[in-house]
């Protein structure tokens, strides 16, 4: 299969708004791949259209593809060739590896046509936003293979790998999906939570009673044990066993021989309060597989059980899974929780959890099963919403459904000491179609100098520099006049921005035309919030 076939399909899907049309177009491509009888080919295509490489990370970022050779006139690259080239780039190491990687990348782009270069650039920089998320892809796999979507989703849930499920279904049919069962040692997609506005909202949505759990500001891990063999996986299913020996030891101390559990690994201070998130995250870095990738010891707290000693618990209600967890894990290694129908008791539990330095609470339906790999209605997260009034410093041209619109906004806090602004991050989250249309017109009016026009191959801009601008053809620097109200989950230490801080999970609430830039929140306010949280 030629790369251009995948690139054209990606462009088609990005231009479609109807879910059924997206599903049909992807299914058409998967059927074409399946007719070649190569399971690996199907797996690669599904991975790419999901915005991922089969190799996960190959050491290529925006700067690597910012300047590429002129495109080829005719398509010649095959999917197999490109996948092999990605593998070669990713495995390049040692002296001169950077130059070698650049040369391999240049050769690849020189052989690619214009539409292929656009696809490759977006794929390699994580900007392939085309609306082909997991649900759409699962439906497309089902349509291509003639398999009910529910069967595909279940297999992907248990196998933790939709591309592998797609390869089996498209090449060998529904019977091939029987191999995807819950297996100790093979990670499954974690169940995710929806959002509630508060504890009363959560109680109402669960019929009056809910299980509330402390939401720790650590790193979620999935732990597998068979005998003396323990594996620890991240939320994204990466194996981090060698980096977390204390988690392995804690698991081996439990009175079971087989186990699959959900837990939170977190760095705690001597007084029991959490360290800032970066301390925990340092133990999950990519600097090798030894504990010295971070020096702070982690504590592990278990909160759910998917399998215990030969018994699968996925389909059991939360209450029964928790009862098995309580019989397996000591109290001091379990996340704090409260089962209640009393809104005041639930609020007091939330307040105490926040006072202890944690993120908020999870509210869970006592009767819900574990929906692996899905954002299930049986789990709700309740966290305080922080907001800041910030100033837009620059905007990037969008991609996918945002093509032709100014989208990703650069956010800055006012610096009273200098009269300037300090960048704290970027976001396009929370923007409606109406907002995108309005802000495109607005920010072109505020453009500081000649604004670069949107082009067919625009993508995300590279990381912002200290002056927050980027003369890269994708970013429009604007006069710092427009105030925007931003919601965020926290403030983290960051070396990426000149203020040393960045917003976590920033999203747009609304534009504040009633405020001037002089009324925006200051960097001192942001710094105080950061220090208070840490």
UniProtKB/Swiss-Prot annotation:
Entry function: DNA ligase that seals nicks in double-stranded DNA during DNA replication, DNA recombination and DNA repair.
A single GO BP: DNA recombination
Protein name: Probable DNA ligase
Annotated transmembrane regions: none
Organism of origin: Mycolicibacterium vanbaalenii (strain DSM 7251 / JCM 13017 / BCRC 16820 / KCTC 9966 / NRRL B-24157 / PYR-1) (Mycobacterium vanbaalenii)
Alphabetical list of NCBIfam families matching this protein: dnl1, PRK03180.1
Pfam families linked to this entry: DNA_ligase_A_C, DNA_ligase_A_M, DNA_ligase_A_N
PROSITE patterns associated with the record: DNA_LIGASE_A1, DNA_LIGASE_A2, DNA_LIGASE_A3
GO molecular function, one term: ATP binding
Active site: 215
Enzyme category, top tier: ligase
Catalyzed chemical reaction(s): ATP + (deoxyribonucleotide)n-3'-hydroxyl + 5'-phospho-(deoxyribonucleotide)m = (deoxyribonucleotide)n+m + AMP + diphosphate
Matches recorded under InterPro entries: ATP-dep_DNA_ligase, DNA_ligae_ATP-dep_bac/arc, DNA_ligase_ATP-dep, DNA_ligase_ATP-dep_C, DNA_ligase_ATP-dep_cent, DNA_ligase_ATP-dep_CS, DNA_ligase_ATP-dep_N, DNA_ligase_N_sf
Keyword Protein biosynthesis listed: no
EC number: 6.5.1.1
Family: Belongs to the ATP-dependent DNA ligase family.
Cofactor(s) essential for the protein: Mg(2+)
Residues involved in ATP binding: 213, 220, 235, 264, 303, 375, 381
Keyword annotations from UniProtKB, A to Z: ATP-binding, Cell cycle, Cell division, DNA damage, DNA recombination, DNA repair, DNA replication, Ligase, Magnesium, Metal-binding, Nucleotide-binding
């Amino acid at each position: 299969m030629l790369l251009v076939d995948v690139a054209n399909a990606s462009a088609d899907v990005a231009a479609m708004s109807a879910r059924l049309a997206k599903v049909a177009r992807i299914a058409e491509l998967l059927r074409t791949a399946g007719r070649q009888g190569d399971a690996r080919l199907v797996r690669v295509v599904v991975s790419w259209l999901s915005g991922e490489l089969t190799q996960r990370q190959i050491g290529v970022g925006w700067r690597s593809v910012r300047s590429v050779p002129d495109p080829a006139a005719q398509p010649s690259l095959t999917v197999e060739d490109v996948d092999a080239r990605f593998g070669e780039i990713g495995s390049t190491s040692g002296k001169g590896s950077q130059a070698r990687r650049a040369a391999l990348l240049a050769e690849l782009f020189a052989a690619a046509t214009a539409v292929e270069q656009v696809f490759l650039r977006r794929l390699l920089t994580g900007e392939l936003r085309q609306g082909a998320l997991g649900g759409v892809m699962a439906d497309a796999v089902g349509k291509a293979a003639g398999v009910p979507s529910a069967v595909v989703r279940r297999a992907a849930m248990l196998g933790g790998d939709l591309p592998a499920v797609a390869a089996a279904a498209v090449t060998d049919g529904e019977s091939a999906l029987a191999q995807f069962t819950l297996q100790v040692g093979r990670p499954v997609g974690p169940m995710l939570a929806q959002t509630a506005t508060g504890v009363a909202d959560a109680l109402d949505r669960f019929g009056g009673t809910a299980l509330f759990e402390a939401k720790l500001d650590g790193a979620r891990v999935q732990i597998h044990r068979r005998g003396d063999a323990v594996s620890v996986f991240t939320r994204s299913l990466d194996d981090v066993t060698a980096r977390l020996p204390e988690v392995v030891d804690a698991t081996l101390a439990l009175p079971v021989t087989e186990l699959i559990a959900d837990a939170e690994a977190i760095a705690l201070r001597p007084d029991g309060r959490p360290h800032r998130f970066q301390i925990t995250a340092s133990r999950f870095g990519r600097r090798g597989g030894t504990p010295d990738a971070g020096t702070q010891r982690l504590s592990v707290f278990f909160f759910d059980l998917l399998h215990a000693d030969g018994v699968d618990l996925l389909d059991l209600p939360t209450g029964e899974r928790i009862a098995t967890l309580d019989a397996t894990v000591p109290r001091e290694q379990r996340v704090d929780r409260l089962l209640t129908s009393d809104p005041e008791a639930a609020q007091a539990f939330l307040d105490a959890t926040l006072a202890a330095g944690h993120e908020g609470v999870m509210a869970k339906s006592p009767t819900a099963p574990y929906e692996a790999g899905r954002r299930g209605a049986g789990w709700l997260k309740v966290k305080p919403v922080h907001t800041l009034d910030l100033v837009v410093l620059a905007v990037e041209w969008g991609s996918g459904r945002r093509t032709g619109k100014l989208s990703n906004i650069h956010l800055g806090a006012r610096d009273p000491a200098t009269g300037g602004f300090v960048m704290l991050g970027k976001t396009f989250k929370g923007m409606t179609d109406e907002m995108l249309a309005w802000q495109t017109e607005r920010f072109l009016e505020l453009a500081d100098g000649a604004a670069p026009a949107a082009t067919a191959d625009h993508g995300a801009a590279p990381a912002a520099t200290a002056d927050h601008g980027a003369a890269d053809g994708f970013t429009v620097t604007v006069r710092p006049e427009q105030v925007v109200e931003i919601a965020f989950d926290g403030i983290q230490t960051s070396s990426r921005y000149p203020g040393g801080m960045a917003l976590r999970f920033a999203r747009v609430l609304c534009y504040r035309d009633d405020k001037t830039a002089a009324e925006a929140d200051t960097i001192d306010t942001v710094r105080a919030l950061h220090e208070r949280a840490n």
